Amino acid sequence: MRPPFWNLAGLAVLMATAGACAPDRSPESPAVPLMPLESYPYPEELSGPLIASWTTIQTAWDLPLDPLTDPRLDDSAESEEVRRGFRIFTDTAGEAARFAHGQISCNNCHLNAGQRERALPLVGVAAIFPEYNRRAGRDFTLEDRIVGCFLRSQNATGRIESPDDEDTYRHLLPTPEAEEVQALSAYLRWLSLGYEPGANLPWRGQNMIAPENRIPVEDLDPEQGEALFMDRCTNCHGEDGQGVAIGDKRPAPLWGPDSWNDGAGAARIYTLAGIIRYAMPYLEPGILTDEEAQQISRFINAKSRPSFPFKAQDYLTEPLPIDSVYYQRP
């Protein structure tokens, strides 16, 4: 039997994961100086600097920091860059179409514009960069990391016709200097005001299946995952995984040509399982077990999705993770 608020939770996901979580508007109050996040007056229902992981219909779209209404931002170019980054974050396919080949927005995984507990929150994230990236085998800047998301989660490589001829596709792909990347960086740096470089972010890494609870990939059953998906997930995501629309709101596709490509982090079994386990369903995250989340993840990542054409350049200096099921193993 489904939990008592399942249908309500489904409604919230439909509306909250659609990407555009706030209207396009300009701040109405006079500008005031920026202040560190820890001094910002958060409402009682918020958990520290984040939205609580459990929420209600009334609070499902709350934002501790909303640059479209925050009076601390003025009419300067710097403030407008933050606002543009927020718009790209919440409607990536619409606001950064040249680098978003599918229908995935940053907001689809990083809920509440990157400000929700246990939903891959990004508050303070700028303080951790540069950071070593195992897949690339080198240190990444924040902008490098954003580029990686465009290439993989937003499938910017989907427009490449000849991956062997760099001259034919170089102009199609984002760089750290691209204006969309710089705008997203400005928004994330704004979310990170008050955090010193190297800051310990206690909410980082919460979306992980504990290593001791990970089921070997070969023991996971896509058919069992499908049964769970049909019972637990279709209210919001539909039987075809493409999302059920209510008005102009729709969850992002979980597979197919408009989903993330097979080089994305969500294309890894345990990574996606951690998101499912702790961030879903939208109003009642955490009601699925570790096993259920992993089985559902195995089902989703047994589906076809766009191919990342440069997988052969990944993990050249680090071992290939055992849950990277779309990669060719030596």
Residue ranges of each PLM-predicted region?
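Conserved non-transmembrane functional hotspots
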Residues: 310-330
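Positively charged n-region of N-terminal signal peptides that target proteins for export
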Residues: 1-5
